[in-house]
């Protein structure tokens, strides 16, 4: 927010696949971007497999009620991209209380992702912290063409527990919709709607007083066979070892979904990082390179040794 006016920041990204000039067999991804305050794109980095890593900076340092953010990403055919955030996002106590909005106004973010054939996009923002009384809602819409892959993960902390804060009248609301174009038309792959508030936080059937929630979703480029899915889920469950919290995962018709509930943002990040590496391994892609903006990961999270030691490692199409 600037003065008494809420922000309405917009960011548009386009990812384009091109042939490397020094190696006609090598593909790399470049980007075009257009942003308005408080968004700013930092310097892009290229992974060793030509994937474009884009750090997105929110210069305002946090959100308050009424702030709106819009992100639009179009990934061209055969492009590979990873979009992350430079730092954790903060949602402060809501403002603008009135008869119409007795708890204050919501801060919001709308994300739209459009992936062409064979595109591969990973949306991996850093942690979101909802302060006491903060109100935040987001909507993510994903449109996939055949053979496109979309992966996203998010970690949310409800209240600053280290400071003794609770959520009080704050809330976090999320909607994720993924659909894919097929020979018989558009098919829904996932519709996921969640709301976390103080009641859910305290409920034994909800968060059970645990302050951290995480969600991981992978829409795979191809259907996974029953055998491949069984081994993938077994490995993902094994990857929970030595991490605190409650973790569960399951298969989609064409992909993977996982949830974390617990006390530790770090544990959620570590488990999701391991799952991320599993999806890369399954497609015979390079081991993930954590963006340099991220906090240090646990030693060995992305080591080849962790994954090659499995007695059964499933493999699928490399695209």
Curated annotation (Swiss-Prot):
Statement: the UniProt record of this protein carries the keyword ATP-binding: no
Compartments reported by the entry: Cytoplasm
Record flagged with keyword Cytoplasm: yes
Predominant location category: cytoplasm
Single GO MF annotation: nickel cation binding
Top-level taxonomic group: Bacteria
Gene Ontology cellular component terms for the protein in this record: cytoplasm
One protein family per Pfam: UreD
Keywords: Chaperone, Cytoplasm, Nickel insertion
S-S bonds: none
Region of interest (Disordered), residue spans: 284-319
Assembly and binders: UreD, UreF and UreG form a complex that acts as a GTP-hydrolysis-dependent molecular chaperone, activating the urease apoprotein by helping to assemble the nickel containing metallocenter of UreC. The UreE protein probably delivers the nickel.
Family that this chain belongs to: Belongs to the UreD family.
HAMAP family given in the database record: UreD
Function: Required for maturation of urease via the functional incorporation of the urease nickel metallocenter.
Record protein name field: Urease accessory protein UreD
Source organism per UniProt: Prochlorococcus marinus (strain MIT 9313)
Upper taxonomic lineage: Bacteria, Bacillati, Cyanobacteriota, Cyanophyceae, Synechococcales
